[in-house]
A protein has these predicted regions:
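Polybasic, low-complexity association/targeting segments
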Residues: 1-6
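N-terminal signal-anchor/start-transfer transmembrane helix
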Residues: 8-24
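Membrane-embedded catalytic cores of phosphoryl/pyrophosphoryl-handling enzymes
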Residues: 14-17, 29-138
Length: 138
């Protein structure tokens, strides 16, 4: 196996994380350490799976079965990011409201999941990373 297939998701994650932090910090006009994690622009998960699908397309071709698997996985990840995790965030908000000011309750994170724009940003970033990594590891 070529090492590039293991390096791609790691490099993509390491590049997209700081980009997301800087974008969120600029939006908040302060260092946004509280926004590190799930959610935000661009979507790390979408970028990682898209970078792998892009790399597979560039190296093995879009007709290769691995590309089909990568695209399927990407759709599952993106659907999860957009719908399921947003529902989890709404449930967390409801639980936080019910708990009120109970000191025994540790507030749950309410910002979960991604908007379609955040997912699209992850897709664009992932495609760019796939092309960049392919060029660097030829």
């Amino acid at each position: 196996m070529e090492l590039v297939y293991l390096v791609t998701p790691l490099l993509t994650w390491l590049v997209v994380g700081p980009i997301k932090f800087l974008i969120n910090s600029a939006r908040q006009r302060r260092w946004a350490f509280n926004l590190v994690g799930n959610g935000g622009f661009p979507s790390n998960h979408s970028a990682v799976v898209t970078s792998m699908a892009t790399l597979i397309a560039l190296r093995a071709g879009m007709g290769h079965p691995a590309f089909g698997v990568a695209v399927t996985l990407a759709f599952i990840v993106m659907i999860d990011a957009n719908s399921l995790r947003q529902h989890v965030g709404r449930q967390a908000a409801a639980i936080n409201r019910l708990a009120g000011d109970d000191p025994a309750h540790k507030r749950l994170r309410e910002r979960m999941g991604h908007t379609l724009v955040e997912i699209a940003g992850g897709i664009c970033t992932g495609i760019a990373m796939g092309f960049l990594i392919n060029a660097l590891f030829k």
